Amino acid sequence: MKYILFSMAFIFLFTNCKKEDKQDPLLSQAKCVDINNPISISINDLITDIDTIGLEVTDSSLLGDIHMLHIMNNKLYILDTKGNAIYIFSRNGDFIRRIYHVGQGPEEYIRINGFQVDYKCNRLILTDSFSKRIFIFDEYGELLKVVPLKFSAYILMARNGGFLNFYTGPKQMYGLKDMENYNIHVLDSCGNFVASFLENQTPHRIDLESTERIDYNPNNEEILFHPTFGNVVYRIDKNNQIYPEYVFRNKSSFKLLTPKERREMTHIYGQKNEIEEKESEGYLLSWGCVYDLDDYCLFTMTGWNHPKHIYYNKSTGISVTIDMEKMKGDVSLCKLFNAPIYQTEGNCFYNIIPLYLVDELADKLPEGKLKTFLQNNNTPNSNPLIIKYKMKFPE
């Protein structure tokens, strides 16, 4: 019955919202996020409440290439794509365990493509697109279940006894047209396809993979989903009803894609890159990077080479555009914080600082705790470092 209700909600939504127009009934209930020209601000005034986490180094916990970070029950879960493993650390960085089940056996994976945490059931959901399976572990790293799939999955969340699969990556991934033409797929507990929702607005081939197109709020069990190049961000509530939550309203000198331009967008790896072309023409382009904090939302217009942040205050409805490349203040701080955001918690952001950047900036930062932390961990055998911080909303 939940799947039927979910389907009916989508039918109603998309018969009434064929255009991204604020006159449409459901879109009129969405919150407007104004895109303005970037503000002039110093990095020293923007970044506050900096804290640091050093990850313990042992023979079993030396990390190579951190791809994803999740936090659950005071534990850090890190996907290392080079090591093909999930590493579990305490919140202060003490090593707990490594999940490494590589092989050809029935309880072994070939390669971890992505993982999410199931806050409600305290589980880890790992996806292996090569063997087309889901691996479910408890919060301590014990394998609970392996679920076979008929397709390759990248971003997949446990939901109401089943799963939600979010389309990401190149086109023609699925044998079913009902999956290929839609962004979100409902699966039952056995991994079988049940229904699809939210029609794909980028039907041309887009060889892009973003792990940040969704953000889950464990406090209210709601998901924010931002379709590739979309101007609308959707909310999926705990009953699997979907609504437009935010609509971008352009008041800047940048351009946003029209629905027609979005349908015609193409990115074929090594052949055609309309993302870079459009960015050079002044377009803001998002692959769907959305971060839902307690009091704010951050939308990252990733683009190709020059990302921009749209920082939205939930209580006032005011938004500011931040261009980290044109930030004022200390140059080394600007470079340190002009990095991908890996996780949020409360009103805090978590960034991973790779060792090459630690080596480059350790002696250049302003005197203080942050500089000392980088200097003390600037050794060949250190792990990448984690920085936790807040962004002060500009007055």
PLM segments and residue spans:
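Short coil/turn segments at the loop-to-beta-strand junctions that recur within blades
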Residues: 59, 100-107, 148-155, 200-204, ...
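Blade-loop segments of beta-propeller domains
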Residues: 56-61, 65, 94-121, 128
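Conserved blade-ending motifs and adjacent loop-strand segments that build the rim/top face
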Residues: 203, 245-261, 316-346
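Blade/loop signatures of beta-propeller domains
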Residues: 21-56
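Beta-strand-rich domains and repeat architectures in extracellular enzymes and scaffolds
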Residues: 50-84, 288
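Repeated scaffold domains used in trafficking and secretory/extracellular systems
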Residues: 65-68, 110-115, 151-159, 206-214, ...
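Short beta-strand elements that form the blades of beta-propeller/WD-repeat-like
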Residues: 75-80, 122-128, 161-175, 215-234, ...
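Asp-box/WD-like beta-propeller blade repeats and closely related beta-sheet repeat scaffolds
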Residues: 129-181, 196-203
